[in-house]
Amino acid sequence: MRLAGLLLSLVALTATAAVEPPGLARLAEQQQVPLAELQAAAAQASLRQEVLDTISRPWEAKPWHRYRPLFITPERIRDGVDFWQRHAATLARAEQTYQVPASLIVAIIGIETFYGRQMGRHPVLDSLYTLGFHYPERADFFAKEFAQLVLLAREEKWPLTRLKGSYAGAMGMGQFMPSSYRHYAVDFDGDGKRDLFANPVDAIGSVAHYFAEHQWRWGESPVEPALIGLAPVSTLLGPAPELTQTWAELATAGIELATPLAPDTPVKLLALEQADGPEYWVARHNFYVITRYNRSPLYAMAVYQLSQAIQDAYALQPQTSPAQPDLVAGRL
């Protein structure tokens, strides 16, 4: 009997949604989506237990010394240099257009999907349905993205059930959520489509556009290594990525930088756990901007350090003329 009950439960968890999820009418009103479209989407969606299992084990729960080696690897650096070389013209144009460094764009695509090779195998509709209506911790966010997916699929003329992405519903080379896809994806090669799945030119332009819209500051380092001395570190640390302190506050507490900042500079003290104890950094505006892509400070630091490693390795390579397919008439 127990086995039969278990089998029935598993079938229920993977079965197509038969009951309209609660709050659908309110969601339709909030997101300005016809209720009938949300109902049709929900009727095609399936509840996926593997999505709930995966989101309960985020990589960002690891300490820094275990998280960093997942992303800062010789292979990812080498392939980042190769990606940069193959798309040098597009990356140069993105830099000029959006004032966002090529190294950052490459690092984002490298961490998110290993330069487009690992874009996710989960049906996006199912993932967002599962998390939007069966994951109370962040149901509001994912329900909104479920509605945004319906709008996006209609606008781009995509079949809802064929879209694949991450367990959290992120899509394409840059892993954009549906709302980000709608607002920040760009047609960077001028072919009339915003294709972040198979078109690296659009993916590069879209990542750059995202950071420009979130106020990336050209030439400003995201973080600075800090010396803490006798500073009361425990009273200065906090979990949120927002820049809730000023450099004057940290300096008064005893924090030191190689080059002090202006006293009113917004900052945040970070502690990253190494195997032999914490290392300390002072985060600045651009670090916060990276956390708009992913709120985890570990993610933001991995992006920054990978971008620096790729940039250093790229500078050592013989420079050749950019590949012709990346050139778009009238864009350079």
Which functions belong to the PLM regions below?
Residues 1-3, 7-143, 148-164, 169, ...:
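Cell-wall glycan-active module
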Residues 175:
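Functionally critical loop-and-helix segments that line ligand-binding/catalytic clefts
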